């Protein structure tokens, strides 16, 4: 059992937590997998071991300097909030599903399983998957996404976003802008932006579809043998410090305007 101290905020405070989870039929090296705090005023949290038959890691709320989780063939599920520097690696068909992550550094990877985070507040994040989809809700900060054979979806991005997919689709809504760079080698890109967003725009793809409700100033369209390049400025800005660049050499880029309310997904 790892040392811990109870807090009245529904969190388990740890300086360093390492968890390894084997397959559902495999051996578990360490089983500190579920944490909940009952009562208030410094009452002790109850830490229970995961059920090896299910192969699932569940975290309710953690406040830590560093959290390291590694699983092979199981599931990592966070039902609440994780605070701190986070490092999660899920091998085989393992999935990672998290309600909220908040910290200075977040590193999450999966191989053939879904990577899903509802809220992400971080200074720097790197999320990757070999063959699973990456599905994010509201993200803030400097976010880097990598996928080899999966789709990337971001419901709302506020800050700097760099997303690269080898084969798949990218679907992103940009609410507030820093620098956004999207690229897919084999697939298409859908970019939705807030109607008032100001940015330099550069789109490059086999086909490009810019909706008429998007106001692009000084738009320049250049055709080439293998596609089209469109550049311009959104909403009468001439700054190059904030920009959106999208590249789909073998696919279609669709650019749309979308309200903040439309970006909300009113479902679980």
Predicted regions and their residues:
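Intrinsically disordered, low-complexity terminal regions
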Residues: 1-268
């Amino acid at each position: 059992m790892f040392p811990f101290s109870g807090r009245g905020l529904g969190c388990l405070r740890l300086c360093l937590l390492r968890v390894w989870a084997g397959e559902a039929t495999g051996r578990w090296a360490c089983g500190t997998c579920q944490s909940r705090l009952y009562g208030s005023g410094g009452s002790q949290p109850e830490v229970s071991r995961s059920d090896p038959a299910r192969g699932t890691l569940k975290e309710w709320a953690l406040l830590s300097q560093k959290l390291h989780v590694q699983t092979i063939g199981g599931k990592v599920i966070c039902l609440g909030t994780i605070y701190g520097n986070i490092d999660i690696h899920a091998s085989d068909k393992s999935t990672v599903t998290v309600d909220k992550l908040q910290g200075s550094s977040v590193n999450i990877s999966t191989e053939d399983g879904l990577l899903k985070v509802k809220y992400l507040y971080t200074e720097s994040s790197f999320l990757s998957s070999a063959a699973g989809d990456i599905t994010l809700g509201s993200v803030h900060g400097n976010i880097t996404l990598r996928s080899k054979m999966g789709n990337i979806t971001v419901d709302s991005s506020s800050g700097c976003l760099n997303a690269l997919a080898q084969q798949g689709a990218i679907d992103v809504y940009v609410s507030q802008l820093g620098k956004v760079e999207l690229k897919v080698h084999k697939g298409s890109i859908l970019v939705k932006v807030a109607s008032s967003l100001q940015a330099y725009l550069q789109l490059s793809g086999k086909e490009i579809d810019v909706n008429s409700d998007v106001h692009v100033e000084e738009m320049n369209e250049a055709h080439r043998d293998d596609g089209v390049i469109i550049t311009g400025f959104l909403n009468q800005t001439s700054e190059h410090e904030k920009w959106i660049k999208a590249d789909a050499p073998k696919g279609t880029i669709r650019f749309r305007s979308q309200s903040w309310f439309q970006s909300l997904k009113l479902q679980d």
